């Protein structure tokens, strides 16, 4: 089915939230659905938030399609957030997107997750994500041209954030992302605003769908996660 005649479905599971966006054809209705992680007591006190991507993703997708007047047999394109983020989490969206595209005869498109974080705040913006292991993922989104090359994220130690900001060649005016608020003091000291609205710090499912609707399609096997660093085992206590 041509993209112009069918629905676009966006999936992102790179972070703690499960985010889905649905976009009807011909500038029709668009909506998103967001699944929250499960809160559990931590072994060393506090609360641990366990993502529920595998449990939530397809149900949220079905709900979003239905809400926009769509159905699975009208699916034309699947857009998956490629990360960076949690290794296991990213793979849920990528694997599900590939499978849906194959089963439904739809095209599949990948897009870096940071492009869909905080688009409402404009550009240039800095996306700051929790990379665990006492590190952060940083991505500078310099523009909103869908035909421009994708920004390249990189990892920095938490205690190296100030130095990383000093070395930026493109100066962002605002920072968003799931770790931006935690490092607001450092960011603001560098002249970078950090919004108080929590909604701008997460993936926007509708923005991801709209972005994916105009990106070139790819073979399912060519849609691969953006991990930034190698996946290897590490104790939870050291993350």
Where is each model-derived feature located?
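Generic hydrophobic alpha-helical segments
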Residues: 57, 61-64, 68, 114, ...
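Surface "functional belts" at beta-alpha junctions
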Residues: 3-6, 24-52, 106-202, 220, ...
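N-terminal beta-alpha supersecondary unit
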Residues: 2-80, 84
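DPxDG-like acidic metal-binding loop motif
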Residues: 77-108
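Glycine-rich phosphate-binding loop signature in dinucleotide/nucleotide-binding domains
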Residues: 68-73, 168-171, 215
């Amino acid at each position: 089915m041509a993209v112009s005649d069918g629905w676009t479905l966006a999936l992102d599971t790179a972070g703690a939230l499960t985010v889905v966006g649905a976009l009807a054809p011909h500038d029709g209705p668009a909506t998103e659905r967001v699944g929250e992680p499960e809160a559990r007591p931590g072994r060393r006190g506090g609360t641990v938030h366990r993502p529920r991507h595998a449990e939530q993703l397809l149900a949220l997708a079905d709900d979003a399609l239905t809400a926009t007047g769509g159905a699975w047999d009208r699916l034309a394109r699947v857009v998956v957030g490629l990360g960076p983020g949690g290794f296991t989490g990213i793979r849920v969206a990528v694997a599900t997107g590939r499978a849906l595209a194959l089963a439904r005869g739809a095209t599949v498109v990948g897009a870096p997750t940071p492009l869909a974080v905080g688009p409402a705040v404009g550009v240039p913006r800095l996306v700051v994500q929790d990379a665990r292991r006492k590190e952060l993922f940083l991505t500078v989104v310099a523009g909103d041209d869908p035909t421009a090359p994708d920004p390249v994220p990189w990892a920095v130690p938490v205690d190296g954030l100030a130095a990383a900001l000093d070395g930026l060649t493109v100066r962002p005016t605002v920072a968003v992302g799931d770790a931006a608020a935690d490092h607001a003091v450092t960011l603001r000291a560098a002249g970078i605003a950090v919004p108080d609205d929590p909604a701008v710090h997460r993936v926007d499912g509708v923005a991801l769908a709209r972005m994916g609707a105009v990106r070139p399609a790819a073979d399912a096997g060519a849609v691969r996660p953006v991990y930034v660093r190698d996946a290897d085992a590490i104790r939870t206590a050291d993350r």
